[in-house]
Structure formats: C-alpha cells, structure tokens
Amino acid sequence: MAVNEKDVGRKSRVSVVLWVFIALGTLFLCKNAFTFSSESIHGLKISSDDSDSVDIERQISLGLTPRKPVVITDLRTGNKRKLHGRFLHITDMHPDEYYVAGTSIDNVCHSGEPTKGKDRAAKFGNAMSGCDSPMLLMDMTLDWIDKNLKDQIDFVVWTGDNIRHDNDRTYPRTEDEIFRMNAEVAEKIKKIFRTPNSPDPRDFAVPVVPSIGNNDVFPHNLFSLGPTLQTREYYRLWGDFIPEEQQRMFDRDASFFTEVIPGKLAVLSFNTLYLFKANPLVDNCDSRKQPGYQLLLWLGYVLDEIRERGMKVWISGHVPPIAKNYDSSCYDKFSLWMHEYRDVIIGGLYGHMNMDHFVPVDVQAIRENMEEQQMSLLSEDERLTKTIREHAIAAREAHLMGAKPVNKESYLDGVLDTYYKGVLQEIEQAVDSDLDIEKKKKKKGKKKKGKKEKRTLEEIYDQHSIVQVSGSVIPTFNPSIRVWEYNISDITDSSSIFGENQLEYQSWDLFFEDLEHKMKNEFDDNESSFWAASAEQNKKKKKKNGKPDKSIPRKKPDELPAGPGHIQQLFSPTKFVQYFADLDSINSEYEKLIDKGLAEHDAINKAFNYEVEYTSKDEPYPMESLLVKDYLHLAADLARDNGLWKIFKERAFISTGYEDERN
C-alpha cells in the first residue's frame, strides 16, 4: 500500500501541535500549583473604597490625615481588606498584677500606707514614680485602641516587655509568671485584632507582629540560642501571629517576619537580645558560635529573598540598635545590614528606653570604626577585658533601668552632642558644587590620616539610617503610643493586581525549608549550641582560612535605587501622630467623679482617654515627610536652636516636665 506523503506531513504537524498544547497545559498547571502552594503568594486586586462610611471629622479629631481607604481583594480566597496607609506601634506595657491603688509608691505600689502626699499610688498609675503599669492602665489603653484606632490602621508593631520589672523581693518574678502574663496580654491583643467570627485563629483583620523584650525572659536579659523552653513557649503563645512555615526557624532564634500586605510589604521581628550587651550569653557577633552571628546570617538570607521578590520591609525589635545597647561588633554589623539593604528596608522601630526620640546612624563612621578595630594594637586578652567591662556596665544599667527615669536628660543631651551636632557639622561642611565634587574625585585615595573626608548632601543622606525609639505605655513618663502614616497614594499606580511579580518565586514553605538546611550546613548540631563554645574558641575572631565573614553584608548593587526610607515612593512614611495619656489630669478627673458619687466603672470610662500630644507636622519644627534626609535636617535644626531642643525634650519625656535630679 502506497504511503501518501501529504497525509504523513499533516499527521506530523497535528502531532507537533498536540504536543505543544500538552506542554503548555502542563506548564500552566505546574505554574498555578507552584504559585498557590503557599498562602503568602497570591494576587491581590486593588480598588478604591466607594462607600460613604469614612468619618472625616473623626480622623481629624484623632490627628490623622483624612483619607479614604483602598480595598485589596485576595484573588484566591475572595476575602477583602481595607488599607488605610497607617499602622500602630505600641511597646513596653509592663502590666503589674500586684499593683494596688492607694498603696505606697516607695513600696513599688504593691503595699504599705503612703507616708507623704505624693507617695500614694494613683488609680491609673503615676508618671515618673518608679511603679509599673496597673493592670487597669493596660486594659484601658487596649480598650481605647479598640474603640478609636482599630478600624483606622493596617497592622500593629508590638515590641515587647509585657511583664512587670523584677523590683520587689516580696514578690520575686518567676518564669511561670512571665509566660502567664505574656499569654494574658497576647490573648487581649488577639481578641481586638482578629477577624470576627472567623474559624481560623490566624485570620487577623489587622495583622500583629510581636517582639521579645528583655523583661519577657527569665532571668531578665538572659536569652540563649534555641531550641529552648523559652523559644518553644513563645511560639506556643504567639503561634497565631507567626506564619506556620517559620515555626522551626523561630524555635531557633525567636525571630520571624509577616507579610502585612502579601507580596508587597513585610514587618520583620528581630530578636535584639542576641545582640544586647546586657545579655550574659552574648560576647560578640564575630564568633560563629555566638547567637548574634547566627541571627545576622538568618537576617541576610531573609533580606535577600525580600529583595528578590521586590518587597519592602520594616525592621522591629525591643532594644534599639545604638552603640550604648549593643556589643560593638554586633552594632557595627547590624548597622551595615540596615545600610546595604536600604533599597528594601524602610526603617527600624524599637522600644525599651521609654523615651520618644530618634538616633541617626552614620555607616561611614561605622566602617572607619571597624577598620580601626582591625588595626588596633590591643592584644586579644586586652580586647576581651575591655569587652567584659563594657558588658558589665551595660548589665548594671539594664538592671537599674526600671520604671523610674534616671539620668534620662543626661542621656538625651548626649544624643544631641554625639549625634545631632555631628550631623549639623556634616551638613554645614557638605560639598555641593560640581567643582568641589570634581576636586574630591581627584583627591580620592589621598585622604590624610585623622582628617574626615567631606561628603555631598546626597552622600550624607545615603550613608545614614534612622533608629526610631518609641515612648512606652508604662508610666516612666506619661503613657504613649504612636500611629505612623505611609504612602499608599501610589498603590493603584503600582499595579491593579498585586502579586503578579510573585508568580515566578517559590513558596515561603520551600524557602524556609531550604533556609533550615543552609543554616544546619553552616552550623552543624555539634556547633550550634552556645554552650559548646569554649572561651578560647570565642576569642578567635578572624578566620585563619581567610573565608569571608558571612555576618557582614555585601555592598548594595549600584543599579538598585534607594528605598522608601530615602526617596518618596510607595510605602514611604509620611507622618506620625503621638498619643499620650495625661495621668495627672486623668487621675484627678477620676477622683472628682468618684467624689460626685459616680460608680467606679463609669468613672473609669469617663476619666480615661488618650489625646494627641503632637504630630510630625506640628510647629515649631514641622517635618515635610519622614525620610532619612528629613530626620537629618531636624537633627541639625535641634543642634543649632536651643529653643527647639527644649521643646523636643519635653516631647521626648511625654509632656511630664521631667528633669534629672541635681546633686
């Protein structure tokens, strides 16, 4: 039988087309399976909110910028959520179940009859008294947030210290009490921000990102690399806040991150206790055995992935990353990570110090310090002795840092002298003409020893980051919380469908599975334990085999533009509103209402209130926006104008009029 060549050709073409369709279909199915294998990777449709339910007058009364929210729809589940371009930062609540109103402040408000007029523990607490927060103060603060802010914010940054200080020998703190109180606080917060009637305990209408404080551990300040009882217990307490795929990594280092806007914006909870000088288990961040070294590697892997996905991130933690608080090697390295990933990191949010202020960090000074350390003629023993002395001082300061403010004015004046005046000098000496820049290029490499090279304004902006330290709920001063506003006006210009760029990336499940293997390969089981590190091993800071120190980041690629903390764009911070509870007025009003015969419950609800203390737009130093350059110019203004500095200090101490005690 003769073969028809045309039929053969036709069948061949049909076969090819069929195989192409099969291949494309398979690719489509695989791609979709890959895309939706994790809840954190999916598309989000963006639309405007056409409802008339926006209460402009209420927003204005809260000091907020009046705006309509944006609606995002999860294309996988169909769930809708509103974005307001705002988030809440709350820290250091320090609730004290032993607080008794009417007792003696000298007895930390736990017992005893007052011996003088000002020695009496007030109903809502006394600013600057040294007592922790009454349970009532915490409850009323959370109740005020529930009634006034919950429906105005997109997420919550919660930076720890959810237990009283260990300042009463009659009632010594126990590990069980610490866990129990943290569980109680966590449940209160879950109740406020969870999606109503949802069967999923992880379904939050407003995502919450907690961090561990130095008083949330037992003994306070001391926290070792996991897995430990404490890391496991905090995962049990916070499991609903932490993405499931990060459980094993959290069990190791008590750090994690949450996509508060999936595929676009994250908040990273960084366990600052592994870099904290006052933690007896922290020697440095140079030894591979050290918790801080290992945590910085984790940070690097996560930031790389966030950068790869085109996302942006806020860093949050309890202890602020300033030289006073961190081991010098930890401070230097952490600051470098903040700088080299400035294309994705928006900023850092911290608590612990109970004062409302900011600290500029100059990466050029950091690099110079690291070079000087390498060139130092100090012997290894001398360096170790110096480190031990610094850590002992830090531990003593941390022990003294209870609720009562001590030498806070002196500290803040030190920030002015060390940081703000340094910024002023840099800005005043900045080279700004093309001729100056050309001369600078020609002189490059001829820098005289001890002489600081001048920079352009743009270089100064680029080489700084800002550490944001928030006021606290505990009445060290007046209780305070802060709402940040950020740019979502460009959100519809970005893409009508968020997450389109996420289609090509692996699920977070696979990423963290891979990361766990990488960390295990880097630090095998025998080496990962902090306790396995001998003193001799800890002293070896330099690698004899010449391998690069992975806890130091690579330089940011030049082609990557600066991120939302440096240039105004989507997610850039634009304004903040500082709220405070004026305890003198509140306690006085409560007493008056009780004297008039009002029931206690009614008097409490009528007397208590948070009000706007100030906003970043307020005189006498209104800020156009909250970029790094805006903070640097504010620092310079504060350094040159004593009148502005006095107002800044009054705000830093939350309108209490605090001054250091004079001898």
From Swiss-Prot:
Biased composition (Basic and acidic residues): 546-559
Subcellular location: Vacuole membrane
Primary localisation category: membrane
Gene Ontology, cellular component aspect: cytosol; fungal-type vacuole membrane; nucleus
SUPFAM superfamilies, per the entry: Metallo-dependent phosphatases
TM region(s), chain numbering: 15-35
GO biological process assignments: polyphosphate catabolic process
Membrane protein topology class: Single-pass type II membrane protein
Sorted UniProt keywords: Glycoprotein, Hydrolase, Membrane, Signal-anchor, Transmembrane, Transmembrane helix, Vacuole
The EC number(s) this enzyme carries: 3.6.1.10
Cited function: Catalyzes the hydrolysis of inorganic polyphosphate (polyP) chains of many hundreds of phosphate residues into shorter lengths.
Protein's name according to its UniProt entry: Endopolyphosphatase
Gene source species: Candida glabrata (strain ATCC 2001 / BCRC 20586 / JCM 3761 / NBRC 0622 / NRRL Y-65 / CBS 138)
Gene assigned in the entry: PPN1
